[in-house]
Structures are given as structure tokens and as C-alpha cells.
Amino acid sequence: QIRVFSQSMNVKTATSRHLPRIGGCFACALDGCFGSHDAALNAPYADETGGEGVLYYDDQKVMDFCKEANRAGLQIELHAIGDKAFDQACRAIKAALDDYPREDHRHGIIHDCLPTPEGIEVCRDYHIQMPMQSAFIGWKQEPDDYLERILGHDRLEKLNPIRTFRDNNIVVSFGSDAPCTTPDPIAWMDRAVNNDNAGQAVSVQDALRMCTYNGAWAAFDEQERGSLEAGKIADMAVLSENPYTVPKDKIKDIRVERLYLSGKSYESCRKSILPMMLRGLTSRNKA
């Protein structure tokens, strides 16, 4: 169920541990976030703070890392929220693939909140995937009125362009970014289908695929997971309603009635983990 990314720019560490993936957030974050005004922007923030945010690395550092990781056969993920960081990620991955072309690399850029048209073209042409968080749409911690105040109306309208990525045949998958947003795929579907920016809303079918198959594909797991087919691992959820037939504004009310992992019914543990940990420590001390 878990796929490990070495959240580091140290390629040798990842390869020495036989990890096929590198990147993510933390050490591979190219910028910060809008709320703290350190998401890197191509133009200044619209509020009184001004400034253009922060790029944590210069272009050469990111390009050198991507080239080394790509030549080592690793899958790369980079965090980019602002448009300046998104462009930097696109330049670096493009440079790596120009240096050493790979047919099925599945490199990705995480978040992709404010992409540029030029960056989208690079992602389309170089088959760079988009692991996004549709839960950021209408997110209570950064509501639209706040984002409009710090970014301006024009950039607000360009945030999280899921439909644009989809129309450019760029693979989009949804994740939670927990604990920042809820790890609830039903909520992800709702936000993608009922996007307040109607021009960026996607169909129920597209949203469901972005929550299931595309996520498995993004981790090279589509032969085992992501859809219900003979021979695959039977991870599945039984829902209270059919998302294809309920009114779109009712998708958010759908509940998971049963969960199966590897074909077996799963029941969440309702017991506190603390007593088990204490028993384990006690038994270890006695030994």
C-alpha cells in the first residue's frame, strides 16, 4: 500500500537503498505556499506584502539533480505551487530528458497550483504527470476571497486548472496532501466536478479515474491496482450511492459503506494504539 520516495536530492542514497523513486516535498520542494507568501511567483503578490515568494534552489541545482536522477533511472517528483516554481520544475525535467531521453519515466510535478501556458506545453510534450490536490479548491484554510486578495483576480482564475491539463492529455492524479487537506477521495471528486471555476470542472468519469487508476499509474502500479480487473489486487470501496447517477451537488454526501483490501473486508481499528505500544515496551524491558 505504500510507495516510498527518497525525499532528498541525494541520488546515491536513493540508489544505494534500491529505491526507484526520488523527490516529493521537503528537500525537493522548489517553493513554499501561498498562505505564507513563499510560493514563488513570476510577478509580485497583489497585497501589501509585495515580493515574489521564494525559490529554494537556483535553476542549475535543480537541473543537475534531475539529470543525475533521470540517468540513474529514478522516477522524479518535485513540489511546485507558484508559477515561477512550476516553470523551474518544467525546465529541469525537460533538461534531464533532453540530456538522457526515457520513454516511460513518469516524472511528475506535485501540486501544480499555478502553472503557466509554456510549462503546460512542456508537460504535454515531455509526458510529465501532475499529482494534484483537488481538495485545495475551496479549501477553508485558503478561501477564494483570501487568495484573490493576495494573488489578484487574474491569477485566482488560473488556479488548479485540472480541465486544462486533461484537455492537453496530461495525466492528473489526486492525493490528499494530508494533514493539510482531508484524505477523502469523495471530497476530491466533489471539488473536481463542482469546481467553483466552472471552466476547469471535469466529468465524474474523469474525476473518478483521477482518484483511482491514474494514481496507480503514477506509481507504476496500474498492472496490480487502480481498477477492478481479473488478476489485480482487489482493493475496493462500496459506496452508498452511484457517483454517475446522483446529482453532481450530492457527490459530497456519498459515504463509504464497506472497504476491501486484497479482496478481504477491512475494519478499522477502534482501539487506542497507546496501550499496545506500552505493552510492547514493557515486554521488551522484561526480556
Task: Give, region by region, the residue ranges found by the protein language model.
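Metal-coordinating catalytic core of metallo-dependent amide/deamination hydrolases
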Residues: 1-87, 91, 122, 127-135, ...
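Active-site glycine- and acidic-residue-rich loops that bind
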Residues: 6-11, 108-117
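Short, small/polar residue-rich loop motifs at catalytic or cofactor-binding pockets
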Residues: 21, 221, 252-253
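Residue-level signal for well-ordered, solvent-exposed loop/turn and beta-edge residues enriched
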Residues: 33, 232, 264-266
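His/Asp/Glu-enriched, well-ordered alpha-helical/loop segment
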Residues: 67-76, 84-86, 91-107, 117-121, ...
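P-loop/Walker A phosphate-binding loop and immediately adjacent motor/lid segment at beta-alpha junctions
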Residues: 248-271
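Glycine- and charge-enriched low-complexity intrinsically disordered segments
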Residues: 265-285
